[in-house]
Amino acid sequence: MVAAAEITQANEVQVKSTGLCTDFGSSGSDPLNWVRAAKAMEGSHFEEVKAMVDSYFGAKEISIEGKSLTISDVAAVARRSQVKVKLDAAAAKSRVEESSNWVLTQMTKGTDTYGVTTGFGATSHRRTNQGAELQKELIRFLNAGVLGKCPENVLSEDTTRAAMLVRTNTLLQGYSGVRWDILETVEKLLNAWLTPKLPLRGTITASGDLVPLSYIAGLLTGRPNSRVRSRDGIEMSGAEALKKVGLEKPFELQPKEGLAIVNGTSVGAALASIVCFDANVLALLSEVISAMFCEVMNGKPEFTDPLTHKLKHHPGQMEAAAIMEYVLDGSSYMKHAAKLHEMNPLQKPKQDRYGLRTSPQWLGPQVEIIRSATHMIEREINSVNDNPVIDVARDKALHGGNFQGTPIGVSMDNLRLSISAIGKLMFAQFSELVNDYYNGGLPSNLSGGPNPSLDYGLKGAEIAMASYTSELLYLANPVTSHVQSAEQHNQDVNSLGLVSARKSAEAIDILKLMLSTYLTALCQAVDLRHLEENMLATVKQIVSQVAKKTLSTGLNGELLPGRFCEKDLLQVVDNEHVFSYIDDPCNASYPLTQKLRNILVEHAFKNAEGEKDPNTSIFNKIPVFEAELKAQLEPQVSLARESYDKGTSPLPDRIQECRSYPLYEFVRNQLGTKLLSGTRTISPGEVIEVVYDAISEDKVIVPLFKCLDGWKGTLAHSEINNLPRSPLYNDCYDLSPRMLLLMLLFSDPEFDWS
C-alpha cells in the first residue's frame, strides 16, 4: 500500500493550497483537514456574510481553476447577467489534458477501466472496446427525465447555470479525463447565457446527478431532444446553441468523457450554493428585524445584555444578541420606552414574551447551522466528485464513491430545519405585533384607518402567515430519511442531495414571503407609533386647555378647586392607549371618557365642603367639562389625522433616529409604499408583493447592511471580557447566571462590597 506521504508528494503538482478545506496534501499537523475546517469558521457571521455579498455585487468576471470557487461566485454567475466566467488556462489546462490523454492511452493499451471499457453500475461486468459508442449510449439512457410542456418540470435557469459552473470547476482539477475544448465550450455557453433545459426531478445525487447532468452532455453532443433557452427566452436545439458559440459540429465524446460530465454532485451542490447564499442573508435580516420588533413593541432591551449571552457560551447566540444590542443602542424608541416603563411599570409585564426576549437564544443556533452548511457546500463545489478518479501521477484509475452527495443532503436537511425555525420565530413575533392584547397599545390587526369597524388591517396577512408557517414546518422534515435503493440495488444508499436542496429552496422562498409580510407589518407599526405620538400630543393639549377653561377658574377669574384635577387628567391620557379611543374620543363607553370622569368624581369627593357651593362644585363642572371636551377634541383629532396623512405632523418620526431606519426608509421611500388603511384601495398583498420582489432581487441587502454600519462584530461592553473568574469557572456551566456571578464576585478579594 502506498503511504499517505507518497500520495501527497505525487499529487502536489495537481493540488495547491486555496485557503478552503480543499487541499489534497494537507500539512502533517492537519492530515484530516479538521484544523482548516475550524479556521474557516473564524470571525463573525456578519463579517462572513458581508464578504459574501461584497463579492456577489462586485464580481465582473469569475476565474475558475477547480479549487477556489465560492458560494457567492456561484450565486453571481447564476443570477447576474453581467458576470462572466473565465477558465484559468495557466493553472488548469495542462492537468486537464494530461488526464484526458491518460484515458486514451490506457484505452489503447487495453487497460480495464470502469466506464471506459465496462458497463455501468450493476451491469459493470459487461465489457466493450467501443469507448466512444459506450459514452454515447450512456447519455442516451440517462436522458430519462421529463421536461414536457409544463415549465414546472424544468430546473430553473439560475440553478442550471450554477450547475454548469460547478461541474466545470470540478473537471478543471484534472482528475476526470475530459478534453479542455469541452470545458471551454461550457464557458462560452455560460457567457452567452445559453442554458440547456434540465429536468427538475429524476436524480438521487448518487451516483451523482446523473439524469440532469446528462442533459448538459446532450447539449454538448447535439442530441436531437436537447433544448436550450437564450437570455430573452428564445428556445433552440442544442446544435443551434453550439453554433452560436462558434462550434459548427457537436462533440463526439471520447472514452470516459460522458461519465466525467454526468457522474458528479454538481446540480445538487449548485442549488445548495444558491440556497446558502440566501439563507445567510435572511438569517442576518431576521436578527435586525427582531431588534426592530423590540422598538415598535416598546420592549425592554435588557435581553441583549452581553453578560447573559457570554454565560451561555454559544457564539451564534452571542453574535445575534450583539447585533440586536447594536441596533437598539441609542434608539429613540428605546429611550421613549424606558420613560414609559418608569412612568407606569405595571402597564406591561416585567419581562417581554419569549418571541422577543429569547430571540438571540433562538436565532443563534440557526446561524451556527447555516454557517456550517455553507462551509460544507463550499468544500463540495471545490471537490472532485466523480468516479473513477484519474490519478495520472500514479498511473492508475481509482474506483471509489465521491459521487455520493451526502454532504449536500445532510447540510440541506439541517439548513432547512434552521430556516423553518427562523420562520417560526418571525410568525411568533408577527402574531404578537398584530394582537392588541400584547402589542403595547397598537390597534388590532395594525389597522391604519380612522374607523376600526371598516378597517381590518393585516388580518388576512396573519392568516397567510399561519399558512406559510405550516408549510415551512412541514418542509422541515428530513429528505435524507426517505432513501430508496436504486439501480438494481447497486445504488442501495444515496444522498438525495438535489431533492433536499430543492426542498430547501422552497423553504427559502416561503421564508422570503414571511419576511416580506413581517417587514411590511413592522413598517406599518412604525407609522402607527408616529401617528399615536402625534394624536397623544393633540389629546393632551386639548384636555389641558379644557381643564383650565372649565375647572380651574371661575367667571371672575377666581381659582377653583378643580384646578387640581388637570395633572391627574393628563396622567389618565398618558396611561390610556391612544388607539383604544381615538376613532371616537368622546364616546361615553370608551375608556378615556370613563377614566377622565372617574378622576373628576374622585376630586369631587375630596372637595367635600366645596361641593355645597354651585360655583366651586366639581360635580357641577363634569357636564361642562365633557361638553367642552367634545366640542374641541373631536375636530382637533380629525385635523391631527389629516395633518398626519399629509405628512405634516408636528412631531418627527422616531424611526429616523434609529439604526433600523435604513430598512424602513427602503420599504417606504425606495419601494414607494405607504401606511395601509381601509380608506385606501391598495391591499396588503400589493405592498407585501413589492417587498417580496425586492427581497428576491437582492435589493434588501444594501439597506440591511446600512443598519449595521459601524458595528465591529463584538459585544458592546468590553468589560464583560474582564470579569474576575473563579478557578471553578469552567465547571460551572450548569449553574444559574446569578449563582455564577456570585461565585465570580467572591473569587475577587479586592471586590468592594460597599
UniProtKB/Swiss-Prot annotation:
Pathway: Phenylpropanoid metabolism; trans-cinnamate biosynthesis; trans-cinnamate from L-phenylalanine: step 1/1. CDD domains: PAL-HAL. The keyword Lyase applies. PROSITE patterns: PAL_HISTIDASE. It is an enzyme of class 4 (lyase). Signal peptide: none annotated. It is found in: Cytoplasm. There is a cross-link at residues 206-208 (5-imidazolinone (Ala-Gly)). Its EC number is 4.3.1.24. GO terms for biological process: cinnamic acid biosynthetic process; L-phenylalanine catabolic process. Keywords: Cytoplasm, Lyase, Phenylalanine catabolism, Phenylpropanoid metabolism. One of its GO terms (cellular component) is cytoplasm. The active site is at 114 (proton donor/acceptor). Homotetramer. This is a key enzyme of plant metabolism catalyzing the first reaction in the biosynthesis from L-phenylalanine of a wide variety of natural products based on the phenylpropane skeleton. Belongs to the PAL/histidase family. This is Phenylalanine ammonia-lyase. The gene is PAL.
